[in-house]
């Protein structure tokens, strides 16, 4: 029969549970980090972790992902962009008015911009104040090629 006084102070024919750490004995609380926590045992260090459907070594061959640059999906899919006809430059997919990574500027405009750039730096170097557009000129960065 189970002793109702087990683990309690007082006359006790059975000594408290000393040899088994991890029990719920107030005199001997369970250790903070038991070597094997109660409950489902974790896999040993050498065991594979992760999804059993995909072994830890990875799939034997890489799975192609459709739409990934550099990987054309197999099947009757049309290419994302039709190849340009020979001799015709590819059409810029950006909407008109949007600035792309490389804006093509004609030689006249380039010269004009270089001049303005030099002027701006010179202006900022010599004047301590009026740095931020107190005397702003009406030159905008639109690519309208005016005749100079």
From Swiss-Prot:
Low complexity bias (residue ranges): 136-148
GO CC annotations on file: cytosol; nucleoplasm
TM annotation in the entry: none
Biased segments, Pro residues type: 27-67, 75-93
Residue numbers spanned by region Disordered: 1-148
Function in brief: Negatively regulates TSP1 expression at the level of transcription. This down-regulation was shown to reduce taxane-induced apoptosis.
Protein known as: Proline-rich protein 13
Gene encoding the protein: PRR13
């Amino acid at each position: 029969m189970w002793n109702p006084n087990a683990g309690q102070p007082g006359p006790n024919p059975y000594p408290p549970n000393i040899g088994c750490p991890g029990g719920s004995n107030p005199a001997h609380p369970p250790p903070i980090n038991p070597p094997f926590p109660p409950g489902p045992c974790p896999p040993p260090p050498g065991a594979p972790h992760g999804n059993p459907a995909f072994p830890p070594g990875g799939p034997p061959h890489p799975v192609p992902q459709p739409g990934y640059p550099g990987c054309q999906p197999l099947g009757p899919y049309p290419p994302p962009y039709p190849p340009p006809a020979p001799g015709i430059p590819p059409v810029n997919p950006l909407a008109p008015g949007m600035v792309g990574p490389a804006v093509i500027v004609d030689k006249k405009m380039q010269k004009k911009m270089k001049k303005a750039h030099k002027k701006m730096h010179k202006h900022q170097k010599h004047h301590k104040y009026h740095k931020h557009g107190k005397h702003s000129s009406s030159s905008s960065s639109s690519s309208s090629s005016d005749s100079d």
